Amino acid sequence: MFVRTYAGAIVGIDAAAVTVEVNIAGGGLGMYLVGLPDSAVKESEQRIRAAFENSGERMSGRKVVVSLAPADLRKEGASFDLPIAVGILAAMSRVDAETLAGTMFAGELSLDRGNSVSYTHLTLPTRISV
């Protein structure tokens, strides 16, 4: 299933909207992040998987493709954890995708069942600029 959520990225002193597209399909394993993510964004996979597993949610046996657009904009930091996780939950039909329409997310997930979301440096600039 395909789902779209939104995030933000810092560009100089401004922020830009980032579209987070999540597609989950059978027949394959792993999470694939595309769209110029830095190493902290790539590490989102590990934080998201740990939070899901610790909350009893399973992603195993599924191929998850996450596209961060626009592809030419560098995405940095852990603030993409929350929009990716919410997109995955919606693609798994655990969250109603229609209720996410036009909503922007930012936050770093804790490993403790996903019950903690940390404030990120991106929250205020994104709120002001986008």
Where are these predicted regions, by residue range?
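Gly/Pro- and small hydrophobic-enriched strand-loop and loop-to-helix capping segments
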Residues: V130
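Peripheral, non-AAA+ core regions of ATP-driven protein-machinery
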Residues: M1-L122, R127
